[in-house]
Every structure is written in C-alpha cells, then in structure tokens.
Amino acid sequence: MRPAALLLLPSLLALLAHGLSSEAPITGEGHATGIRETDGELTAAPTPEQSDRGVHFVTTAPTLKLLNHHPLLEEFLQEGLEREEAPQPALPFQPDSPTHFTPSPLPRLTNQDNRPVFTSPTPAVAAAPTQPHSREKPWNLESKPPELSITSSLPPGPSMAVPTLLPEDRPSTTPPSQAWTPTQEGPGDMDRPWVPEVMSKTTGLGVEGTIATSTASGDDEETTTTIITTTVTTVQPPGPCSWNFSGPEGSLDSPTAPSSPSDVGLDCFYYISVYPGYGVEIKVENISLQEGETITVEGLGGPDPLPLANQSFLLRGQVIRSPTHQAALRFQSLPLPAGPGTFHFRYQAYLLSCHFPRRPAYGDVTVTSLHPGGSAHFHCATGYQLKGARFLTCLNATQPFWDSQEPVCIAACGGVIRNATTGRIVSPGFPGNYSNNLTCHWLLEAPESQRLHLHFEKVSLAEDDDRLIIRNGNNVEAPPVYDSYEVEYLPIEGLLSSGRHFFVEFSTDSSGAAAGMALRYEAFQQGHCYEPFVKYGNFSSSAPSYPVGTTVEFSCDPGYTLEQGSIIIECVDLHDPQWNETEPACRAVCSGEITDSAGVVLSPNWPEPYGRGQDCIWGVHVEEDKRIMLDIRVLRIGSGDVLTFYDGDDLTARVLGQYSGPRGHFKLFTSMADVTIQFQSDPGTSALGYQQGFVIHFFEVPRNDTCPELPEIPNGWKNPSQPELVHGTVVTYQCYPGYQVVGSSILMCQWDLSWSEDLPSCQRVTSCHDPGDVEHSRRLISSPKFPVGATVQYVCDQGFVLTGSAILTCHDRQAGSPKWSDRAPKCLLEQFKPCHGLSAPENGARSPEKRLHPAGATIHFSCAPGYVLKGQASIKCVPGHPSHWSDPPPICRAASLDGFYNGRSLDVAKAPAASSALDAAHLAAAIFLPLVAMVLLVGGVYLYFSRFQGKSPLQLPRTHPRPYNRITVESAFDNPTYETGSLSFAGDERI
C-alpha cells in the first residue's frame, strides 16, 4: 500500500493545484492566480465563470499630445507624459495606430438598431480594411505568440474564437476536467481588449501540444491524462471594420472591398476621442458613395448622441464640428459588386469654449477669452450694485463652463457713498416700479473742500404716502432742501449743498407703486461751477474743471429735440460761481419735419411712456432722386393705438402700412423721396410701462434702378466706383494678404440690372508666384505650380557668372502670401584678366601694339623682307584666371636670296585669309607712301618757282615772238628801278 500511495501522490498534488487555480483565491500579496496587474489596474484572464462579462476597456494608444494646449492643461499633460515614459508591460500583441476597433465605453453606441457593435469574434476576416493614418507613433512591443494547450477536442462549427493566454497563464501541470472551451460568443475579460485577428480567407488553426500519459496504479483507481493536437480549417464571412482614434488629428479612410463576393455589406464604425476640453472637427476630403450606402456622424459625450450629418449633407470640403470631445462615424455599404463606396475624411481636435456670458441688465461685461483660462469682468451702470461674482473664469471640462453664475445689477435701498464725485442714486427696481413698505437712506459725502449738486433725472411717486426728502447735511436732523410733500414741481436747476453732504430719504407705504426716482450727483470745487448734465444728449466745454468764464454747448441724441433752456451757457460770478442759464432738456417730441439723409423718429417722451389721446405727425424728406428705407426696430404700442406710414408728403398718399399692438423688427421701403408717419394714441388708456412706444430709424437709399447689393466676401473687401449701384457701376473685390481672388475681381452693373460676373471668393494662397527666367541661364524646378516648399535652381550658361542665390525656396508666411527665400539671381558676363602685350620679334612687327590685350583678342606677327616667320602668325588671348596666350610668340629668321623669294612666295601662298588683308595693307603703304612723298616734293618745287621766281621751271621755248606793247606816258608804272633811272647788279656800283 505504501508504494501505491506514493504513486498516487503526484496526481493528487496536480488535482489540488488545479482546484486552487480555478477558484482564484487572493494570495498574500494581493494577486489572484488568474489575475495579472498592468499599469496599476487589475485585469482578469477569462474563466468559465466570467464568460458572459463585458470586455474590460483598456486603451493601448499613447497619451494624447496636444500641440497648442492651454496652460491650465499642463497638469494633465504632465501626468500623461509621466505615464507614457513609465515602463510598459510586455503585451502578447502589437497594436497599430489607430488600432482595430476595441470595445469602448462611449455612450449610446454600444448597440444601434438592435445589432451587435461588432460581429462575433472570429480568427478570420474576408478582407482587411484599409488602415487609416494617424500621427500617433505605434508602440514597438515584441512578444512571442503564445501557445494554447487544451484538454478536449474542439466543438464543430463554422468558426470559433480562440483566446490568447499570457505565457505565465499557461497551465504547467495536467489540466483538470473543467477546462475552458472556446465558444462562438468570444472571450470574456482578458489581460487586454480583445482584437479580431486579421487572417487569410482560408485559415488553418493549429493548436499544438504534446501527448503525455501519466498512470497511477492502486487498489481502486487509475488516472490517465492525454493532450490532443487538433487542426481546424474554416472559411470566414466578412468581419468587423472598425477603429478607435485617440490622437489630436488623423485620417478616416473607407475600407477596401472584400476579396470574395458576399451577401452582406460592410458595417463599419469609427470612434474618435480627443482630450476633454477639445472638440472634434471632421473635414470631408473626398467622398463617392453608391446609391443605398449610408454614412452618419454623431457627437458623443452628452446625455444623448447628437446627430451632426449624414450622406445627404456630406460634400467635398465640408467641415463638421462636434461640440464634445467624442464623435462617431458609421458606414454601411452594399455587398459586392455594387459596393463599397469610397471616402476620405480628416479630423483634428479644436479647442472648445465657454458660452458668452449673459450681459446683466443695467450693466455690461468684458471678456478676455472664451477658451479655458479666459475670464469675464462684470460691472454695473451708475446707481446699480453688482450682486454676485465680479470675475468669472472659464474652466476646462468635457464642455468648458464658467466657474460661477453670471451676476446681476440691482438698485440698492440706501447706502453711504463717500468721496462722491459723479454718479447716480436710483430707487430699488428702477426703471421699473419700486416695492411697498420701503425706507431707504443715502448719505452722499463729497471730497474735502468740495460741494455737491443734485440733478433730478426722474421722480415718479404714487399719490399715496410715498415720499422723497433731500436734506442739506449728513443726518435726518439736517434741514430739508426738497420735500415731495411740499413741492409740486421739480427744480429744473437742481439742488446745491452748502457743505460736503446730502442726505436722501425715500419711503413708501403698503399700497401703490410707481417708477420711483433717479438722482444724478456731481461734486465740484470751490470757485468753480458744477459739471452740467443733459439727459439723452451731450455737451462740449471750453475748460474741463468749469472755472468762471467756461462756456458749454449742448446737443441732443438723434430723435430728441432741445427744449427749456439755452444751447450755450456760461459760468459767471467770481464770488459765487454759477451758470447763467439752466441746463436744457432733450425730449422726444410729438411731430416734426426732418430733412436729414438719416435719422431716428421716437415715440413721444421715449423711453418714458407716451401720453394718451396724442395725434403726432412726422414728415421725412430726402433728395428727389432717392427713396427712404424705414427700419422699425421697436414697436410696442397698445392695441388701441395706431401707427401709420404714408408713401408721400401728406396724409392723402398711399398707405405703406398701418400697425397696432406690439410687433417685431421689420423694414419698409418707400417709392418716393418723402414719407409721412402718423401716430394716434387711444384717449381712454395710456402706456405706463418703461420703453413702451416705438423707435424708427430711416435711411436715404437709391431708387429701384440699381443692381442688387453685393455682399462682403470672407477674407476680403469690396470697393464700388460709386455709392449707388446704378447701371455702369463697377465693384472691385480685393483679398487680404495671404489670399487671392478666385473668379472675376471686377463686377459691372449691366443694363438689365444684373451683375456681369458671379461673386468671387478669397482663397488662401498656398504657392509662390513664378520667379521667372534669368537671361543667359536655365532653371531646374521641383514643382511646376511652386507650392510651399518648392525650390527653383538657376544655372548660368558658359561664360557667365551667377550673382545672387542659386536656389530659391518657397516659404509660407502667417501674415501674407508665400514668398521666395530670395530675389531671382542674375547671370553676368564672366570677367577675365587681360593678357600682357608681347614684344615684336626681332626683324619683325606685331599688330596691334598694346600693353594689355583683353581676353579673346588676337595679335598678328610679320617679318621684314629677307626673314622667315617661324611659329604662329596669329595667337589669341585665351580667357582664364589668369588669361594666357594660345601659343608662344614666333621669331623671324634670315634666309638666302633664292630661298627668300621662294620662301616668301610660299609664305604668301600659305598665308591665312585672316592675315592676307593686313599684309596687303602693309604692302600698299610701303609702295604708295614714298610715291606720295615724291609727288608732294615735286609739287612744292613747282610752286616755289612759279610764284617766287616769276617763271615756271617747266616753261618751253616759244616758236614765235611775243607781241610788243608800247608803254605810254599815261600808263601806270610803279617800278622803282625805272623811277630812279638806274639799274644796279650785284658786283657793280653803277651802270
């Protein structure tokens, strides 16, 4: 028995080990046998008890890198970088970027149309979809494909999914009888998200193992364990074609058609998730779908999916934006041969923003930025106080939001205002009605050595016991300067304090209500007048501090008329400075004639309520060749009140429109240059509410003989040749720097009142202009359209030197069109040094005789008679650095007489054509120059004898005697010799 027990001991230990592993008890270190810890998260391997659990979501994409993230995101980004730099666990697969579709916790997309998100996992797919491109760099994980050992034969079926186990999860002992069997439903939770493996159409699935037999003999039992190797070959149907994207930008490409025909089309999902605080922008680069194919785009991350677009609205160049950081695209194609269609989308993350904060009533808001980190600053109008946060900050989230609610501006009931310079006091609820049972006290205190002036903007109290008291002091005991109980009319000039203080009391009873009061205060120095004020108007002054002698001129806002005062007032009286006239008032009056080209018509007493039983008429007149556009911006009148517009200058003209009761914004156009407006209020009732009435803006516009108004174009502007778009008007469109006009930039208004061309657009310039050719060169271009990054290289012809940059590169600019890196070069004639002149050979000559000869010049040599030229008769200055002569200079050698003549004849016969003309010239000069000299000598001798000796040396003897002429006494004779009567000769004294 003892040997038998020893033989059974290994089998019992193996069974015990398998039982412990199947129950997965937690060890002392906190790890279960079937659980592996990865990056701080526990992920469980599939077990039979967990086969129906959802797949655990684990992303394998690297941490999102945002190129231009907000500073508030640095914490999250740094955390992501640290997680990225941490050593990654060795995984049993190598994902691409983006990976094939993995189950994702994105809401509302796990099940659509009651169909599974992806088909049953199979180890074979009919066709591998085209892998989209992304900027994310895939992880380089290397791991040996695991081997799977199973303990039972595989069940029959068309396909199956085989889980991949980690090496440490492989059973090292004989598996128990309850081994996990692959099923059609696919694995449950695993160490990583399950990814369908892409295989060929016909796949041989081999599960290899070793056959081992262990036998234990005993009295009553025998155990045998066998490992079987099985190979299954299956033909798979089309599988899923879906991906997850988590980068800041990437591409979505349509899947390729299956390699074999199928009765089922593709059903593909593309899930995009970017960093929270960013939205997803998808641009349609190209799309071509078959009839019946569908594409839907939805925004995710909210309580419900947000439909964004479908195949009916997806056109090339269209941009779709998801207001959340997640988006999904679903593509359903037709089976072959009809489908699938093709598409190519690009997506990128864009920064989301907070909504523009609501402007408080009786206040305003200024915003630095609507993006996370931006702030909004609220402030109230004079007389109102801010209730709530003055500053709001936009916080980053899936949908950015303000850190607090928008504040409101309220009119406080009482308060102390110290160092009061200029401001307002309004009753609670103003300009609406105040409430009952109020008791409000305000104390106004001016700066040192200054006084206060109070101006009554409005006082409207109920006729019961409501009361307003203003005291000339700082407490309730000070003497009153105004009491609504005792004064029926308001002081137009206002109130002046004798010191630094005013004390204001406002009280209401339990019944009745009205608009209340609005008081304006201003402090002024001793020896100066107070700052004047006109409601619904403006003024200009000659001095900012209003000393004595200051003049002030008033004007009213459009629609108001100056009343009850002078347009110009002056500060007078040095001892007690004061204005010589009270400030005027600007009011919206009933009726009037207006001849301006643009203006405003207001209901009587606007924005205060108009009176009952009024009948007002306004006449508006513009130039004769124009018409009037009426822009009715506010129309809130009673149902018994009537507002009528007449297309002419009296009440007999055609009625343009007649209105009663409230109405929204609308416009009217007249056909003439005049319009008459009539307002009749119901005598029985009156409007008591604030801003009850109407506001009408009018403008002078051209008649109906004009072309339609042309709109502005994005990234550009228009410039018409004249304001009226009549026939012949030319409108020129231009684009901002960095953009160019696409289409005709010049449009003309034609006879039929239509424009000659379609509206152009401004398109971003993505290429440089042609830099042009350079004379005496050729160029090499990298792209014929010269896009950004293109280069142009210039190469000069032989004999020319390039000046400038030989290579030009097209660079992009943020504030303008792309520009070349440099100007186009020039090819200049290459300059060479001259050759030094050569001396003439002995007994010879050279031509020309110069000290320096330019490159390319030629020297000719010749010898004297009786000498023979040995060498080249002509040599050339060869260009170079330095330049040099083509041959050495020749020499002249003496020759015999016979040889001279023979050699000379031979030389002349062999003389090159280029030197024969020169030698002939030399020969002619040698012959004719002596001849010319001899002729000149003979001519000179002849002239000498003919003029100075009185006879010609060439005179010949005559054949007959010359005639004799007697000399008469009367003839003139001036010979001195004959006058003296003597003739002397050399050597004789007397004859």
Swiss-Prot record:
- Which residue range or ranges hold the CUB domain? 241-353, 413-524, 590-701
Summarize what gene deletion causes: Mice show reduced exploratory behavior and motor coordination, altered maze performance, and poorer memory retention. Molecular, morphological, and electrophysiological evidence of defects in dendritic arbor patterning was also seen. Secreted and membrane-bound isoforms in null mutants exerted opposite actions. The secreted isoform showed an increased neurite number, while, the membrane-bound isoform displayed a decrease in dendritic arborization. Embryos were viable, fertile and normal in other respects.
Q: Which residues have a glycan attached per UniProt?
A: N286, N396, N433, N538
Task: List where this protein forms a coiled coil.
Answer: none
Q: What are the Low complexity biased-composition ranges?
A: 119-132
Question: One Pfam annotation, family name?
Answer: Sushi
Record domain Sushi: where: 352-411, 527-588, 705-764, 766-829, 833-894
Annotated keywords: Cell membrane, Cell projection, Cytoplasm, Disulfide bond, Glycoprotein, Membrane, Repeat, Secreted, Signal, Sushi, Synapse, Transmembrane, Transmembrane helix
Q: Supply the CDD domains for this chain.
A: CCP, CUB
Q: Which residues cross the membrane?
A: 923-943
Per the similarity annotation, which family is this? Belongs to the SEZ6 family.
Report the protein name in the record.
Answer: Seizure protein 6
Q: Which organism is it from?
A: Mus musculus (Mouse)
The organism's taxonomic lineage, starting at the top:
Eukaryota, Metazoa, Chordata, Craniata, Vertebrata
Gene label: Sez6
